[in-house]
């Protein structure tokens, strides 16, 4: 299944570029990088300088799809493990 704006929340996000637009922790706002790991509640982002940062799946994110298209996503839609989100998609 290809990443599209409608189904991106049901995919594993590892490998996608991301930017934090808004977050309850103000130090996370503006953070950019590549998602290298994803858990139920956190994204691990590798910044361009190689630094790893764990970010809670709260606030608002911009994900860059493999096609280059940018999608704005609310963090609460990303909560849960990728396989759990996919199960919800398949049931719908």
UniProtKB/Swiss-Prot annotation:
Keywords: Cytoplasm, Endonuclease, Hydrolase, Nuclease, tRNA processing
Keyword Nuclease listed: yes
Highest taxon of source: Archaea
Gene3D superfamilies tied to this protein: Ribonuclease P/MRP, subunit p29
Enzyme Commission code(s) on record: 3.1.26.5
Described function: Part of ribonuclease P, a protein complex that generates mature tRNA molecules by cleaving their 5'-ends.
Name of the protein in its database record: Ribonuclease P protein component 1
Gene that specifies this protein: rnp1
């Amino acid at each position: 299944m290809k990443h599209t704006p409608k189904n991106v929340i049901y995919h594993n996000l590892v490998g996608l570029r991301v930017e934090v637009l808004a977050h309850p922790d103000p130090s996370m706002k503006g953070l950019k990088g590549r998602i290298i790991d994803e858990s139920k509640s956190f994204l691990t982002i590798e910044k361009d300088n190689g630094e790893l940062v764990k970010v809670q799946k709260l606030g608002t994110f911009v994900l860059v799809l493999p096609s280059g298209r940018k999608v704005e996503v609310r963090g609460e839609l990303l909560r849960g493990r990728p396989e759990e989100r996919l199960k919800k998609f398949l049931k719908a």
